[in-house]
């Protein structure tokens, strides 16, 4: 096991060095520096900020049908990186719908991302299905970040009938058995509130796939009831409408929540 970890570390270091050589600009900033790796069969990556003293590590959780590259090369998450954050992602066993193995994947990524980035994990970011994956990691994981940010988050698996293939993927994720109630975030609002995390939801009432009222609307109401620090930003447009992806809102929340504002 130790030999395997050393080998992974050497491979990651070589990749990082090569990417630095390829991407360092005249200013010395590394706008596209990445480290990629493989943790027990799951591809992972981190995007590194242009500083040796990062503000923290943010872990991004992809949605159904996506992978560890989702949003990682776009301007939304890159705004966080340019502000001084390490941004990490994983395959998380693809269509995991927050099952136990995805929580194990999160803990492995946590350790690896901190090692590669030189900062502490402070923020989870969940998109669509990634809302369930990240919130379940928050409840069931050995370690918990102080901050959580969800975009169009799916948090009630019983309401995913309009998401193509979701019912089949959810069944497969839980071995053909009904998902446990303690893996359905809307039903774990009390436990989520007790983590002490600060929550930010971004969702649209016009989302045709993830119903607003029974997902973001309902869980925000329950979190408020249980005394959590939670806010909701309502946007317009369908499920992946650009209005969801405000770089300013993401960066401002991350820094305010983590206490890392300049």
Regions found by a protein language model. Name each.
Residues 63, 71, 214-262:
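C-terminal catalytic histidine-bearing segment of alpha/beta-hydrolase fold enzymes
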Residues 117-128:
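Alpha/beta-hydrolase fold nucleophile elbow
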Residues 103, 135-178:
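Hydrolase active-site cap/lid region
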Residues 27-51:
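N-terminal cap/lid segment of alpha/beta-hydrolase-fold proteins
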Residues 54-55, 63-98:
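Short substrate-entry loop that stabilizes the transition state in hydrolases
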Residues 169-217, 221:
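The feature captures the conserved acid-bearing segment of alpha/beta-hydrolase catalytic domains
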Residues 126-136:
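Glycine-rich nucleophile elbow surrounding the catalytic serine of serine-hydrolase chemistry
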Residues 96-117:
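Alpha/beta-hydrolase active-site loop
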């Amino acid at each position: 096991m130790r030999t395997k970890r050393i080998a992974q570390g050497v491979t990651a270091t070589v990749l990082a060095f090569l990417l630095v050589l390829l991407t360092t600009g005249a200013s010395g900033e590394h706008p596209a520096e990445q480290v990629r790796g493989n943790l027990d069969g799951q591809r992972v990556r981190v995007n590194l900020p242009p500083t040796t003293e990062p503000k923290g590590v943010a872990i991004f959780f992809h949605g159904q049908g996506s992978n560890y590259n989702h949003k990682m090369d776009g301007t939304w998450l890159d705004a966080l990186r340019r502000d001084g954050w390490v941004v990490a992602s994983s395959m998380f066993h693809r269509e995991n719908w927050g099952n136990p193995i995805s929580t194990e994947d999160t803990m492995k990524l946590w350790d690896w991302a901190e090692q590669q980035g030189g900062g502490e994990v402070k923020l989870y970011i969940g998109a669509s299905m990634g809302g369930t994956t990240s919130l379940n990691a928050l409840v069931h994981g050995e370690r918990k970040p102080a901050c959580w940010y969800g975009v169009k988050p799916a948090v009630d698996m019983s309401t995913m009938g309009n998401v193509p293939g979701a019912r089949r993927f959810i069944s497969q994720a839980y071995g053909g058995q009904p998902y446990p109630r303690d893996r359905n975030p809307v039903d774990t609002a009390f436990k989520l509130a007790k983590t002490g995390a600060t929550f930010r939801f971004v969702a649209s009432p016009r989302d045709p796939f993830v119903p607003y009222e029974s997902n973001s609307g309902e869980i925000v109401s329950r979190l408020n009831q249980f005394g959590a620090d939670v806010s909701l930003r309502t946007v317009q447009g369908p499920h992946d409408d650009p209005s969801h992806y405000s770089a300013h809102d993401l960066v401002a929340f991350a820094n305010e929540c983590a206490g890392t504002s300049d």
